[in-house]
Amino acid sequence: MSLLFQGITPQRLFKTALIASAIHTACGYAASSDPSVLALSDSKSSSSEPVMTVNAPQDEKRAGSKISLSAAELRQRGANDFGSIMRYEPLISATGSSGGSSAGKSGFDRAGYTGYNIRGLESNRVGLDVDGIPLPQATGRSYVGRAGLDSFGIGRDYIDPYMFGRIDIEKGATAVDQPNTSIGGNVSFRNKTADDYLRPGKETYFGYQSDYDSSNRSWHNGITAAAGDEELRGIFVYSRRDGQETENNSGELDAYPANWHSDAFMTSGIWQPNDEHKLSATLDYYHKTNHSHYDSWDTSGNTVWGTAQQQSDTRRFGASLSDEYTPYNNVIDSLITRVYWQKTEAHDNTYMPSSASAYQTVYSDYNSDTYGFDTRLAKSIGRHELSGGLNARLIDTERPFRQSPTPSVYSVIMQPQANSRSYTVGGYVQDKINVDFDSHHFAVIPGVRVMYQNTKPRDVSTLTTNSSALDSSDVSALYGSANTDTQVLPSIAFQYDLTPTLMTYLQYSRGAQFPNDTQLYGSWNLGSSYAGTAQYALIGNPDLKTETSNNYEWGVKGLLTEGVSINAAAFYNDYKNFIAFTRYTRSGNPDKFVNVPSNIYTTYEAENRDKAYIYGAEISSKINFGTWFQQVDGLSANLAFGYTQGAAKSSYLGDRYVDLESVAPMKAIVGLAWDDVDRGYGAAVTATFVKGKKATATNRESFTNAGNAITDSSTDYMRVPGYGMVDMTAYWNVTKNVKLSGGLYNLTDRKYWDYLSSRELTSDSQQDRNDQSLAVMPGRTFQLGVNVDF
């Protein structure tokens, strides 16, 4: 059997074949259908925007699964935070934990979103950026030892959706022209620009948006103002949000109280002195403060010690300068160059019980500074569309952590990871070779990206705070070396126009995920010496290899026939060198303890331990019935479906492929919308169906690794039940400049859990059972909003 399908059972191969056959049938039908264009444009004016859509395919004929969501589509989805942006995406979801829950976090870890899951990979394996500037990684939870694998203390939610004119979503390993390399995809938040609102004949714009969301009793007020002409123009955007805890629908335990507010502003200017240069400057700022309090439990999870009170602050500052040079001469067509800076701060201050009779304050921070530049060039020569680029960035991170009053040797928590500095340099070249085959366009697109990263620790002496057994020389011996790697990432795509409006493609790409600072330098218990020869610690590994992937995808996108659009893809990805923790003992593995401090006798060390594969398919379609029946012009249907399967296997003796718990269950979305353009109103009904799933536990994180074979786990995770949910929305253009909109979400008040955020819930203790209640998603909620545009 080919290595491509190694580890897949015949049943799974059969399922994949069925999916591929179904899409192939659709392609064959499309190739023989009328190659006419869609009668109704996908980009309508604000007066005819549908209230809710499942995204339709892009018109751009480019291989791969990349979609874009406009500011109008975000409003239609009721997208008012990090998670609701992906409300109607079949294979994308936001992961996180609810306030007060211990699932995947400690008593001093903040609640909220940790990142996105795309096609089964999540959090730090999915890139996030604002205007191309990468957002910080989610912090690992080394202070809870190996149990913290794939859970995070401080997440990646540094954004306000109102600030963005577009969100680009790349599924699967990133393309060669993407400087922020990730094996799981990328989500790029694009700030609004003056060009989004101004055009010849319209030199000013003012917009005001106000809306209310009952799920967390939040109010939002946003202002967008733009002015200028063809030479000089600018924009200012401000957003303010105030809210409380997000209510659950458990009927057993209310969400713990929270009160939060956020401010965001952005301003940018464009100077276009001539036809060849377009210079832009952008400044943006985001700050959110959250106050919360919740129960704090003993180690058994059966007794509440008291109430923890937490203040979390999240800040991001950004600045960039860019020049778009478009001479269209014999050497280049365009050259885009940009420099940028970003500073982020995350501060969690928690006053919490340290025992049944004492309290402590935990200060947990994560700060980063990013400096970078990128440049990209394009030139068309005959049938060749050549492009290339260079990029470089420097990221400094700090992880301050302390407890007050000074804890005992039994309860001290060391700084979770060393401060670090990371350099990344990359470049790419790509060629699109266009060929005409009997009036059908065909293109071959080879490309390659080369990436180099160097990460090294700084100020390692901070890891010795409050330790009598550890000094700077011990930490320097363990973590003193830098982690460096160079990756060559080739890709090739073939695309063919079945009709003038429908294309099919086949592509291969290689992906890479460099080790992050938590994996390299994360530590717990390293400075402790209270347990004698039973003393153990979790340690990072500066010698980690880069996680890599091979990604194969075949798809079709465009118009099947007039009035019917489609975007479908089937994919298979295999991964190696996944990072996890392996147990070693000083007596059994002395070679692993050469640089480990002498007070430690057992380690759980980060290693490239696992390999995995994920395969699946997704399809979305939009049908405009008015194309054939004039009487129902304005009636449309949206359909989307996503299916994935995956498994992972460690290098332990006797291990086997076990279902990958980060792979989400099957999901389908069906929507029906009516838009009356003449009267300026519309309504939509959207149903979401998700299959139930139970994650499979393994013993990999508790395995003794003493020469015996690994056994199956007896841990019983909660089966997350499937559900069906209905949303209803409507809008009304009261006047040319005023629009009212609203929606009812979870109309039937369905009690349900999000699988990706609830998959490791158990019912062993009272705290576990409380976590199940806290994880229930909101019941019936509503949103109301008004938009005023001039």
Language-model regions: role of each:
Residues 256-258, 276-332, 343-368, 403, ...:
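Flexible loop and strand-edge segments within Gram-negative outer membrane beta-barrel domains
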Residues 383, 435-438, 444, 451-453, ...:
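Gram-negative outer-membrane beta-barrel transporters
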Residues 212-242, 252-293, 311-326, 434, ...:
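Transmembrane beta-barrel wall of Gram-negative outer-membrane proteins
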Residues 306-328, 366, 416, 420-422, ...:
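Outer-membrane beta-barrel signature, preferentially recognizing the C-terminal barrel domain
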Residues 138-139, 512, 576, 689-705, ...:
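C-terminal beta-signal and adjacent terminal beta-strands/loops
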Residues 83, 87-138:
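Extracytoplasmic beta-strand/coil segments of soluble accessory domains associated
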